Amino acid sequence: MSASQIYHEAIKALATAAVGHGALVSPHGRALIDNPLCGDRVEMEVELREGRISGLAHQVRGCLLCRAAASVIGKRAAGANAAEIERVSIEVSEILEKQKPASSGWPELDVFSPVHGHRSRYRCVQLPFEALLAALRAAAPS
């Protein structure tokens, strides 16, 4: 599959929309994750209420795939708890590795199915989810 098939219009639209881009005033959890192989960097911040995401912001320095994945998170993560985000993260890996269709109620994840077979790009999509999980762990009470 060519780069033009991976970076299709839906990916470009999600990356451009940048849903959730910004910073929170007083986040409960924050994580910064880098991919040294490609230079992508994601900073994710969360606020929680009763164990569920009540606020979320991200800053991404990365490729279209990384920015699009962060935008999907910005669009869908509100109201989710850590276990739900973990399931979505596993689903993302299955979409990339096994070309399984999205089933979590996050239909936008299907836009990443053309990335299947391009292993060097998997982490670009997964990085925002890793950052969100790390931010949720940082927000969890000790």
Predicted regions and their residues:
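C-terminal binding/interaction regions
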Residues: 1-20, 80-142
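Alpha-helical support elements that line or immediately flank enzyme active sites
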Residues: 69-81
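Functionally engaged cysteine thiol sites
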Residues: 38, 63, 124
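Structured beta-strand/loop patches that form or line metal/cofactor-binding pockets in enzymes
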Residues: 14-60
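Short, thiol/selenol-centered motifs that function as redox-active sites or metal-ligating centers
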Residues: 60-69
